[in-house]
Amino acid sequence: LPLYGLESAKGSFFKTVAEAAGVKEEDILGHDLFLYNRMPGTVWGSEEEFVSAPRLDDLQCAFSSMEGLIAGKNEKSICVHMVMDNEEVGSGTRQGAASTFLRDTLLRINLGLGRSYEDYLISLAKSFMISADNAHAIHPNYPEKADPVNRPHINAGIAVKYNANQKYCTDGISAAM
């Protein structure tokens, strides 16, 4: 899969990056390469009932939860909105949901406010967390390809996800809310 050009492309990828960064090619010591689909989202369908866009589920959840946090009125508590990376590969990276980032940050906030470690543990016990994601609905043209038990339908309300291995934070209380 060509990422920069075909075999006949002139120059190196790192030369182009170095020029853009204003450094020498040999000054690039390492890299992380992120590829993004830059196609704009589109609304389509006979009644414009469908939205197609890259990363739609993650961005939709991030946006709507941030809007909810901003709209909320809570002067007694510290409200936190966390958007993590690497959910598609198991969340086990240092910036993923299984990392210590949130725990460490909340502890530092508590300690910075002059609270004790016990106060931090109490605040965690009183906290309410939501893990937001989209559920993939049954494709109307290929219903046989869908999960035989869990069958979300388009525009039929929210889906509450459970996982036997507790990979979601759904429990009786969060499901009831």
Residue ranges of predicted features:
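N-terminal hydrophobic/helix-forming segments and targeting peptides
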Residues: L1-M177
